[in-house]
Amino acid sequence: MILRIPSLLYLFTLLTAVYAVKFDLTSDRNPKPKCIWNFASAHSLVIVTANVPGEPDQQVDIQILDGSERGNVYLSKKDVRGEARLAVTTHESADVGVCLTNRYTGSGNPRVVRSVELDVDIGADAIDYNAIANQESLSILEVEMRKLEAVTKEIVEEMGYLQRREMRMRDTNESTNQRVKVFSVLIICCTIGLGVWQLLHLRSFFKRKYLID
């Protein structure tokens, strides 16, 4: 079966994900970060485009990090104003978070709301295929095939990551169950030993009192 170009384009739109959000960020003197999380494979390009309108007495900070065991912090940018474009490359497969805080620096009411637009492109979505097409003289179909190849590779890597995580969780559950079994056996042995000791102690006590032979 041969897929036509419209079918390829439709399939590509199903596979690719768009992480564009707009939300309100409330200022505070000790603000809590508001994070947007997305999965990214190892060595993936992540481009974050933030549109932060300038407001007086407010400082918006952006931090890009991941949720791995190492807790890698890829970038921290202070006092973002206007449109900012940030690019990082991930070290390992994990959820990547873009965290924003809105710190109030004035002397009045700190509870001021600022609207923020955030666009996160990961992997194939972050690659400039127009530049590649111009550089390598690729046709539209060849460009779409490149996109599909990159997206398919990302899906395979994500499935592998989920499988490895499931195996780690299963190993953890099996280890926990084994420890519970050992602990239960120890409790039973201690209970039996304590019962035997009490019987011997009572027998010795009754003998001293001449209650039994």
Swiss-Prot record:
Function: Constituent of COPII-coated endoplasmic reticulum-derived transport vesicles. Required for efficient transport of a subset of secretory proteins to the Golgi. Facilitates retrograde transport from the Golgi to the endoplasmic reticulum.
GO cellular component terms attached to this protein's record: COPII-coated ER to Golgi transport vesicle; endoplasmic reticulum; endoplasmic reticulum membrane; endoplasmic reticulum-Golgi intermediate compartment; Golgi apparatus; Golgi membrane
Residues exposed to the Lumenal side: 21-181
Pfam families: EMP24_GP25L
Stored InterPro entries: Emp24-like, GOLD_dom
Keyword Protein transport: yes
Domain named GOLD: residues: 33-122
Residue ranges annotated as Cytoplasmic topological domain: 203-213
Coiled-coil region list: none
Taxonomic source organism: Cryptococcus neoformans var. neoformans serotype D (strain JEC21 / ATCC MYA-565)
GO biological process, one term: intracellular protein transport
Record's keyword terms, sorted: Endoplasmic reticulum, ER-Golgi transport, Golgi apparatus, Membrane, Protein transport, Signal, Transmembrane, Transmembrane helix, Transport
SMART domains associated with the record: EMP24_GP25L
Protein name: Endoplasmic reticulum vesicle protein 25
TM segment ranges: 182-202
Family of this protein: Belongs to the EMP24/GP25L family.
Membrane topology field: Single-pass type I membrane protein
Recorded superkingdom: Eukaryota
Region forming the signal peptide: 1-20
Keyword Flavoprotein assigned: no
Subcellular location: Endoplasmic reticulum membrane; Golgi apparatus membrane
